[in-house]
Every structure is written in structure tokens, then in C-alpha cells.
Regions:
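WD40-repeat beta-propeller superdomains and closely related acidic/aromatic-rich repeat-like regions
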Residues: 1-340
Length: 340
């Protein structure tokens, strides 16, 4: 039996943009599908785009008809789920062999679907939205299993625990709820206070988990967003990532930008060695931050050509894709450039 290929050693300080493609309209989300062949992106032209980096081919998928921020996949990589600002949940064939239109569409929420997640075993779908609800759906037939209530503000993000038995949800005020999937029971409430602010001048809340995921063993929950907000109306604040101990709910560390940067950590990734990566964007432009597990401030950062609005780690864990306001998808490798 042949040995499995070794994963190249990562060196964040050598991170470089290796490939990019112009979609041509501002992008708001991006995801690698589980096999790493395609990248999908939600765009402000009301479409979802599929890009195959190996060939450079891009395809505009028909049928979203909305801004799509929420993208998820079945574990086998055959089906993509998207949620848009119109409240519709869509099932798509990933490869395009069965067409480039949704295979199924349901009216899932009143208003914007903020997040979509698929259970580790691929049998359930979770969605959350501006209607303050979380809904659990049967993956196979799209039927509603149950609705989870309790949040008092829009539910920005959700994540299934790797054990498949729990679901984490976080709202605008960064209240974090731990749900039992089998019963729908709310097991406990946590909070990441640093990721929420109230602007007395504009009488507005700002914050929430703009990105959220568990690490591989489920011991920690990473939450990306904005902190130290000085103007809620203009969204002026600094990007941050909070790491919570999932068992105790304790805030382990808050990763911050060393220098002033006005923006939000829209997308985050966790490397196998615990390194935290965040794609930040705002009025200061676009920046990729790299933190060591115990580092308050980044040990490296990479300036991007334009505002970064999402980031997702590739299945091989050596590179990531970012979506940008200038309409480009960019793939960056966390290894040294190959010698020519």
C-alpha cells in the first residue's frame, strides 16, 4: 500500500497569492467544496459562481436570484446548499453534470438566511436568519424537522459540533446557544461580550459572529467579527477572533490586530497546528491575519489588493480562497513559492 502524501509544512510568512480570477461583480462569500476541485462564490449580481482553479473555467449558476452569504456542502461533496437574502434554501449539484440550476428550493425563513450548516453525517441541515430562528431540515427530502427559538436578535451564524449531537448558534449580540440536536433542547447559554457593542449615539447594536467554526476535535469554538466599535452606523471597529473553550465556555484568548485596522473578520480558518487565519475587510481595505494559538497579536499579516469579504481553507489545509469587493477570487498558498 502506497504511503499517503505528506502535507507540506506551513509557513505563514511565505503566504502569497498564487492564483486569481475576475468574476466581475463584488463578491460576498466563497467556499471550497469538500474535494477541492471547485470554488463557489456568492455575488452581488444575485448569482452563485463556480470556479475550477485547475482549468480557470468559471460558470454562472442560474436560480439564486439573491445575495448569497450562506454556503455549505454535503460531506460527500455532491450537493451544495445556499441561503440568500430572499429566505430561500437551495440544493445544487456540485459538479454541474446534472445541470447548473437548483435541484430543490424551499422558502425557509422570513428575510435573510445568515448561515447554513450540514451535520457531520449529512442527514440534517441547519439554517438561521434575520427572523431570529434556527431551523433543522431533513437533507434528503427538505422537510422541516424542528424550529429552535430563543434568540432575541438575528442569528448570524451556526455550527454543528464534530460529535454531531450539538449545534452552536450566535446572534447579533454574540449570545451563543448550545442546542441538543436530538431533542431541540437549549442546553446552555454562553457569550462573547467582546464581539458586541451598543452605540448610544445611533442607538444601534453592532457585532455578532460574522464567522464561526469548531476546531477539528470540537474542544474550541472560534468566533470572528468586530470589536472596539466607535461608530455603529459606519461599522467602524477592529477585526477580532475569540476562542472559547467549548466544555467550560471560558474565553481562552482574543486575537487582535496589532495596528489599527478598520474592518471585520469576515472569514476564519484553523490550521492543524492551531494557527488562526482571518480574512478581514472594511474601510481600511483587505488584510489576512495569522495568529499563533497563544498570541494576542498577529505574528504575520498579508495585505490584499482589495477588501476581503470571506475566507475559506482548502481541504488539503495548505491554501485558502478569499472573496473580494473588487470581484476577484484569490487563492493564497501558505508555503514558499515553487522555484522556477
Amino acid at each position: 500500500m502506497a504511503d499517503k502524501p505528506k502535507t507540506p509544512k506551513l509557513d505563514a510568512t511565505k503566504t502569497h497569492v498564487a492564483k486569481e480570477i475576475k468574476i466581475g461583480t463584488p463578491l460576498i462569500s466563497c467556499r471550497f467544496e469538500p474535494k477541492g476541485r471547485f470554488v463557489f462564490a456568492g455575488a452581488q449580481d444575485f448569482h452563485v459562481w463556480r470556479w475550477e482553479p485547475a482549468t480557470g473555467k468559471k460558470v454562472q449558476l442560474k436560480g439564486a436570484d439573491a445575495w448569497v452569504r450562506a454556503i455549505a456542502f454535503s460531506p460527500d461533496g455532491k450537493t451544495m446548499l445556499t441561503g440568500g437574502f430572499d429566505g430561500r434554501l437551495l440544493w445544487w449539484p456540485v459538479s454541474g453534470d446534472d445541470g447548473d440550476k437548483p435541484a430543490r428550493a424551499i422558502d425557509a425563513h422570513h428575510g435573510w438566511i445568515k448561515a447554513v450548516a450540514v451535520s457531520p453525517d449529512g442527514t440534517l441541515i441547519a439554517t438561521s436568519g434575520n427572523d431570529r430562528l434556527i431551523k433543522i431540515w431533513n437533507f434528503a427530502d427538505g422537510k422541516l424537522v424542528r424550529t429552535l427559538t430563543g434568540h432575541e436578535s438575528p442569528v448570524y451564524n451556526i455550527a454543528f459540533h464534530p460529535n454531531g449531537g450539538q449545534l452552536a448558534s450566535s446572534d447579533l449580540k454574540c449570545n451563543i446557544f448550545d442546542w441538543e440536536i436530538a431533542t431541540g433542547k437549549l442546553a446552555r447559554k454562553l457569550k462573547a461580550e467582546e464581539m458586541h457593542s451598543y452605540d448610544k449615539t445611533f442607538k444601534a447594536d453592532i457585532g455578532g459572529a460574522r464567522s464561526m467554526l469548531f476546531n477539528a476535535d470540537g474542544a474550541q469554538l472560534a468566533i470572528g467579527g468586530i470589536t472596539k466599535v466607535t461608530n455603529a452606523f459606519a461599522g467602524v471597529g477592529n477585526p477580532a477572533v475569540v476562542m472559547l473553550d467549548w466544555k467550560t465556555g471560558k474565553n481562552l484568548i482574543q486575537h487582535l490586530a496589532k495596528a489599527t485596522f478598520r474592518g471585520v473578520a469576515w472569514g476564519i480558518a484553523l490550521a492543524p497546528d492551531g494557527m488562526v487565519v482571518a480574512g478581514a475587510g472594511g474601510s481600511s481595505g483587505g488584510q489576512i491575519y495569522f495568529w499563533k494559538p497563544d498570541g494576542k497579536n498577529e505574528f504575520h499579516k498579508l495585505k490584499m489588493k482589495d477588501t476581503c469579504r470571506d475566507l475559506h481553507l482548502a481541504p488539503d489545509l495548505t491554501h485558502f480562497v478569499t472573496a473580494h469587493y473588487d470581484g476577484h477570487l484569490r487563492i493564497s498558498k501558505m508555503t514558499a513559492k515553487a522555484k522556477s
